[in-house]
């Protein structure tokens, strides 16, 4: 038996007027998703426990079968692990976005324009962060380059207790009341202001402005935490697993849970990633002897944050055709028994351009026989109609692997 977890980050949504009051899942042409919904157990679940913010770190931890209330230690440490950053028990890791703010003279008067600086390239992002690190790193503060706009700051010999706001939650809003506060609030605020002074006239940003692109004109900190201690996935569930992803968060989760984390050429974590490359690599690692592949695609989430309806529908269709469909067709052609868990981690509604705590639709599919309750298509409304609701989303993985559904 082979297991496929197909996760479209932020794929769930709310009805959108421009789509005829349908969601992107309802509007998309996705025959493979609809097939597993019609032949599997389809319902709704909460991946993020009540009282916790609906972020991808807590949600993907739950999808992998780990209770966030027990195991969650923050987002940035997972990303730091993926970057190869060694974290001591007394270190705090903090996510650092390089992003676009408006250009008022007073930093506090600025507005959050673009949390990703126009999905800045890996090469440009790395160059800018290394430029800042050379000028701003100290014995206490260390900036580390990741990919695109996603980077990491480590505070050594530190404690938790700083209030930080995710930048994608405040797109188009003033930043004055969203600055770091609490234990290291002033330290991080000063770092952000200084970063904007250094980045303002950097050649990369001058070129981006000339090309009509958003400049990466400031750092922004969020997602503090300490390195988690996670029971290995194979020890917990008895199967060997790998994760196919582009973002450091998921790579870090894979590393911390003992999964294989192969490099996927062309996988960017952006709105228009190489979907086919992910499908091919997923099949490749299943062929290498692994039992389970966890395929994470960031594109629907990025589209939701950008408010890009067309791109979100397109991302869902590409996931269906180039990843889920590719895997199902190849496994069926071989006569291989397989199971599919299909779901988002959380919604990223176009309407609000950030994550919501709404439940998400899921499917558990077994290629050997039809399961119930099924749905005629895979979407939020049809999944809700089945009446199947799993309150604790982290329990789905055990049901999936044991085929107890």
Predicted regions and their residues:
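Feature captures the catalytic ectodomains and active-site-proximal regions of enzymes
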Residues: 1-405
């Amino acid at each position: 038996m082979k297991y496929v977890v197909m996760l479209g980050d932020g794929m769930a949504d709310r009805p959108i007027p421009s789509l005829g009051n349908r969601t992107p899942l309802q509007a998309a042409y996705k025959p493979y998703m609809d097939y597993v919904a019609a032949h599997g157990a389809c319902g709704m679940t909460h991946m993020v426990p009540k009282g916790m913010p609906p972020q991808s770190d807590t949600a993907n931890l739950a999808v992998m079968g780990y209770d966030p209330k027990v195991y969650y230690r923050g987002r940035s440490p997972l990303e730091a692990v993926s970057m190869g950053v060694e974290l001591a028990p007394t270190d705090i890791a903090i996510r650092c976005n390089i992003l676009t703010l408006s250009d008022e003279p007073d930093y506090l008067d600025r507005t959050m324009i673009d949390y990703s600086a126009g999905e800045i390239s890996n090469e440009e992002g790395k160059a800018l962060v290394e430029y800042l690190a050379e000028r701003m790193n100290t014995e206490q503060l260390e900036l580390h380059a990741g990919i695109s706009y996603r980077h990491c700051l480590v505070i050594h010999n530190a404690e938790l207790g700083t209030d930080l706001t995710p930048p994608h939650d405040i797109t188009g809003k003033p930043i004055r009341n969203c600055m770091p506060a609490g234990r290291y609030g002033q330290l991080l605020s000063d770092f952000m202001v200084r970063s904007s002074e250094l980045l303002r006239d950097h050649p990369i940003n001058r070129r981006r402005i000339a090309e009509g692109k958003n400049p990466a004109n400031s750092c922004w900190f969020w997602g503090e935490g300490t390195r988690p201690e996670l029971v290995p996935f194979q020890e917990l569930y008895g199967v060997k697993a790998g994760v196919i992803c582009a973002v450091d968060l998921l790579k870090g989760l894979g590393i911390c849970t003992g999964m294989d984390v192969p490099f996927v050429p062309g996988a960017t974590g952006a709105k228009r990633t190489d979907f086919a490359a992910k499908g091919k690599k997923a099949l490749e690692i299943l062929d290498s002897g692994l039992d389970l592949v966890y395929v994470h695609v960031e594109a629907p989430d990025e589209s939701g944050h950008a408010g890009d309806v067309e791109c979100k529908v397109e991302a869902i269709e590409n996931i269906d055709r180039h990843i889920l469909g590719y895997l199902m067709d190849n496994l069926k052609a071989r006569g291989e028994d397989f199971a599919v868990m299909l779901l988002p981690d959380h919604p990223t509604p176009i309407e609000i351009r950030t994550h919501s705590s709404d439940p998400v639709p899921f499917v558990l599919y077994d290629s050997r026989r039809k399961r119930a309750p099924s749905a005629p298509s895979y979407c939020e409304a049809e999944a809700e109609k089945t009446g199947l609701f799993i309150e604790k989303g982290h329990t789905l993985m055990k049901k999936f692997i044991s085929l107890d559904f």
